[in-house]
Amino acid sequence: MLDVHFGAGNIGRGFIGETLADNGFKITFVDVNDTLIDELNKRNGYTIELAAEGQKHIEVHDVKGINNGKDPKAVAEEIAQADMVTTAIGPKILKFIAPLIADGLKLRQANNNTTPIDIIACENMIGGSQSLKKSVYESLNEDEQAWADQNAGFPNAAVDRIVPLQKHDDPLFVSVEPFKEWVIDKSQMKNPKIQLKGVDYADDLEPYIERKLFSVNTGHATVAYTGNMKGYKTIGEAVKDDSVVDQAKHVLGETGDLLIQKWGFDPEVHHAYQKKILSRFENPYISDDIERVGRTPIRKLGFNERFIRPIRELKERGRDYSALVDTVGEMFFFNYPNDSESVKLQQLLKDEPIEQVIRETTDLKDEDLVNEIKAAYEKHLAAAK
């Protein structure tokens, strides 16, 4: 079987690629990074290291690469014969690869290939595959859309594995934590015959996506932003500070309250899940930079993102969200010149009053929440002086 995977980066190779290879798939990685594509084509394999005691190595074989910037036609031809398409490129990039996927579907139609294919966005976002579908359909006419409705599925997915920023002499070598979770919405699949081992299938994915987003992503970002306020540069340094861990525990307590109320998760099971998350952040074999975990703060301040959405929903339920608001106040101090959103955020803070910056970045219309975030920001500002 063949999977066309968009994104030859660390997550693509170290998580999605490993799982697919373990299921006997050949993988064609699609990327614009010449170095990665050239090495994949030269070696047809790469090594994954598990960041844990023993540092076990896993060898992945039967892979190749296509540079979509140089040879988009080859990408379409590969999709035309693929059994599955996956992505791990970041939510903002999905719309840019959509025309390539559309071309692949057009070619499948032209070749009368009616074998159903699922196209799965493995991104940190709610409704990733369905969002990708909308972008793909913009490049299809009515007849092509009708054909795709019958033959192409876009099942949403929830993915979870910490893959830190890293540099190695071997550009394909990647280190990942042992824990991994990949859940696919089986109700949206067109080819349910493909059942991957190491992947869970659910009728309703939203509880899993929110559990992951509001626990792992919110918790990890909390450690980054709180650690940043205290001058730490790595997550490893930050989690040695009890005050940082306490902040993460308070935040996870609030998001856990929401998740248990909203989705009916078993409290005991969920608290064990939260404990496991904190232990993953404390993994001594993973050296993750605060800059990587905290990057793109404007996106992370979004209305439906990891902080503002749980804040809104907790307020609606009359529950406590004070630790979440406190962390959002810290986000405005994230200042890394290599991160364009961080630079933009700092410029906004110079040009506009804080309450206007809060409204712009969060899309909040609730002035009480805007003022609560403003108060948190001003508290941190006073403490920093």
From Swiss-Prot:
Enzyme superclass (EC): oxidoreductase
Keywords: NAD, Oxidoreductase
GO CC terms in record: cytosol
GO terms of molecular function: mannitol-1-phosphate 5-dehydrogenase activity
Protein name: Mannitol-1-phosphate 5-dehydrogenase
The enzyme's E.C. designation: 1.1.1.17
InterPro entries to which the protein is assigned, alphabetical: 6-PGluconate_DH-like_C_sf (IPR008927), 6PGD_dom2 (IPR013328), Mannitol_1_phos_5_DH (IPR023028), Mannitol_DH (IPR000669), Mannitol_DH_C (IPR013118), Mannitol_DH_N (IPR013131), NAD(P)-bd_dom_sf (IPR036291)
UniProt-annotated binding residues for NAD(+): 3-14
Reaction(s) catalysed by this chain's protein: D-mannitol 1-phosphate + NAD(+) = beta-D-fructose 6-phosphate + NADH + H(+)
Domain of life, per lineage: Bacteria
Coiled coil: none
GO biological process per UniProt: mannitol catabolic process
Family assignment from sequence similarity: Belongs to the mannitol dehydrogenase family.
